């Protein structure tokens, strides 16, 4: 993972959407990219169906090696709470990590909501000082994480206007 720019996102909902949107940004800049996520593993134009949101450690390293061999420079990756709890991404060198939302929908694999939150929060808490952590300030539980990471923090919000990035004047159209 050190040989490429790696973006990892955790959330209760929206991980897949975020990884696909991020890949579109990479493509807009003509960056050779890949996706690791719930639906597919995508290495440039090669697509394989996923078995897990975040592959087992050995498989994950195999995918990274294949991406390196194919000169992939940017990867967008979904990081599940179970993968974090089971240390599947331990020593994975993320350049950017994001935690965008949390709700008690997927706590069945954890002893409690607190354990579920702590698993997800570990992506932010263990981010290196050379990386960037993105946090949604509209999620009250995520706000303290800005002080619990060595990473450079970028915050955003729609309701909470104190973020690094704020959203306003939202218009929906069809």
Predicted regions span which residues?
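Flexible beta-alpha connector loops of hexameric P-loop NTPases
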Residues: 47-57, 105-114
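Hydrophobic anchor at the start of a short beta-strand
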Residues: 33, 74-75, 153
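Acidic, Mg2+-coordinating active-site environments of NTP-dependent enzymes
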Residues: 94-174
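Short, basic phosphate-binding NTP loop
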Residues: 1-10, 17-30, 164
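Short beta-strand-centered segment that lines the nucleotide-binding/catalytic pocket of NTP-utilizing
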Residues: 30-44, 79-80
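Conserved helix/coil segment N-terminal to the catalytic DExD/H
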Residues: 82-90
């Amino acid at each position: 993972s050190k040989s490429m720019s790696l973006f990892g996102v955790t959330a209760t909902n929206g991980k897949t959407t975020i990884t696909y949107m991020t890949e579109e940004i990479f493509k807009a800049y003509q960056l050779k990219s890949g996706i690791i996520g719930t639906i597919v593993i995508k290495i440039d134009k090669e697509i394989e169906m996923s078995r897990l949101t975040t592959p087992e450690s050995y498989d994950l390293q195999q995918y990274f090696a294949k991406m390196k061999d194919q000169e992939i420079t940017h990867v967008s990756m979904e990081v599940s709470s179970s993968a974090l709890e089971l240390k599947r991404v331990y020593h994975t060198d993320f350049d950017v990590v994001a935690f965008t939302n949390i709700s008690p929908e997927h706590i069945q694999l954890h002893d409690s909501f607190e354990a579920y939150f702590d698993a997800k929060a570990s992506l932010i808490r263990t981010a290196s000082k050379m990386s960037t952590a993105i946090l949604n300030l509209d999620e009250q539980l995520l706000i303290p994480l800005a002080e619990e990471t060595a990473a450079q923090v970028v915050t955003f919000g729609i309701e909470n206007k104190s973020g690094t990035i704020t959203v306003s004047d939202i218009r929906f159209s069809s």
